[in-house]
Design a protein with these regions (language model features):
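Short amphipathic alpha-helix that is part of the acyltransferase structural core
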Residues: 2-42, 50-57, 62, 184-188
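Conserved acyl-donor/pantetheine-binding loop and adjacent beta-alpha core of acyl/acetyltransferases
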Residues: 65-99, 103
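Conserved acetyl-CoA-binding loop-helix of GNAT-fold acetyltransferases
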Residues: 100-120
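A general structural motif
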Residues: 51, 88, 125-129
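A short helix-loop-beta-strand connector motif used in the catalytic cores of GNAT acetyltransferases and
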Residues: 45-64, 69-75, 210, 217-221
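Short amphipathic alpha-helical segments and helix-helix/interface helices
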Residues: 44-45, 112, 143, 199
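Terminal substrate-recognition subdomain of acyl/acetyltransferases
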Residues: 1-17, 121-230
Length: 230
């Protein structure tokens, strides 16, 4: 019998979580520091009654997870997100800040893409509009996964304990006009990701964050885009 010289990589799967997964969820959030201080065992358990928990498993181990709740949910997390958005921009649901192991961060894009097939398909109707939140201080490694899955960054706002969060929307909900714009139709700006104030100001001016890349200094930089006036 012939054997491969290379180990088979562990399989990555996504499924809806149940209350029996609570201990693993708590472990992930417990390792996220102050940005996840809101994630007490009681709070995380309560979210099972308010919405849905989803997780990504690598070789059977939970490595990334997040909760999706209705925007009108009574949870403090949903209330904080509602307060950060104007009524006209309020979506139907919120994807609360995720938690992941170092291995799970590398699978964040795949996790969100698979999750999107279930929760925000490309032809999503208005009642399926969604906004996701990612903490600025510790979420940078996850942010790349959101961009990989097609999300767009549109705001930076203080949320839990006044800590700033990125707010993003998934693909299919902010579609550009048909056709490929020429270079003159879109203005592009590149800003160090660490310059949160500059990023926030550009987002307020109508720019959207679309990608992360490594800058000349080796630090993460954010690409922002805005259509030029016709």
């Amino acid at each position: 019998m012939e054997h491969s010289l290379y180990p088979v990589p562990p399989r990555f799967t996504v499924r809806r979580l149940v209350l029996m997964d609570l201990a693993a969820i708590c472990t992930l959030y417990g390792a996220c520091g102050r940005d996840a201080a809101w994630g007490t065992r009681e709070t995380l358990a309560a979210l099972f009654g308010e919405g849905e928990w989803w997780g990504g498993f690598l070789g059977g181990e939970l490595v990334v997870c997040c909760a999706c709740v209705p925007a009108r949910s009574a949870t403090p997390q949903a209330a904080a997100l509602r307060g950060a958005l104007a009524p006209a921009r309020l979506p139907a649901r919120f994807l609360l800040p995720p938690a992941a192991t170092p291995e799970g961060r590398a699978f964040a894009g795949r996790f969100l893409s698979l999750l999107g097939e279930r929760l925000w398909p490309p032809c999503a109707s208005p009642e399926k509009r969604l906004a996701a939140a990612v903490p600025v201080k510790t979420g940078g490694l996850l942010l790349d996964g959101f961009f990989e899955a097609g999300f767009t960054l549109f705001l930076v706002r203080p949320l839990a304990a006044l800590r700033p969060h990125y707010l993003l929307t998934p693909p299919g909900l902010r579609q550009p006009a048909p056709g490929t714009p020429n270079e003159d139709a879109v203005r592009r700006v590149h800003i160090p990701l660490a310059d949160t104030l500059a990023v926030s100001r550009l987002l307020e001016q109508g720019f959207c964050g679309t990608a992360l890349y490594e800058g000349a200094d080796g630090q993460p930089a954010l690409r922002l885009e805005r259509p030029n006036p016709a």
